[in-house]
Amino acid sequence: MFDQASMNNAQQGARAFRLILNAMARPGKVFTLPSLIERSGPAYATTLTVLLALGDHLTSIYLAKAFSTAEIEKLLRFHTASQLLEDRAQADFAILNAADAEMALDAWKRGNPEYPDQSATLLIQTTSLTLGQEVQFSGPGIQSPITVRIADINPSFWKARAAANATFPLGVDMIFITPQEILGCPRSTHVSFAGDI
């Protein structure tokens, strides 16, 4: 029997997947991400949508303490079948608040020379992608340096990120997320402070 609802859900999931890939291919550009699911506790609907689009039974997820609730864990297990890990060093994805993102950036999975893609993607929730301290993004996918203003991110975070990604192509990818929008920051993106380029 034809199931229109299932087809619509699949189409919406495919659109979300393409939009997320586009955000990673065009670092620093803000994209509006239609939600596939309602917000759950502290986890934005957009954050959960990213995990629903990218996660599956072969992936693993680390939840920072604020997000490690029974409701969120149940939701992720049901919709993604991903394994939920307490060891961040083994996780493929992680949900973090911006305030917690700087902690032990070098502790995440960064891939290896043969399989650099076997690394972590950090989903970092913030309050705004336009009202933070100004930094410049440059690198692959960016035609000319682009100004980015992610709220709740300290300069020390960008320095820790540079150190964690110093042995490219090994490194950690990031997606910054608000209740409606996402901004990609792959490991290949160079981040500098205004005037440093």
Model-derived regions, located:
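Internal, well-folded beta-alpha domain core
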Residues: E71-H190, D196-I197
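N-terminal, charge-rich interaction modules
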Residues: M1-S60, A64-F67, F78, P179-E181, ...
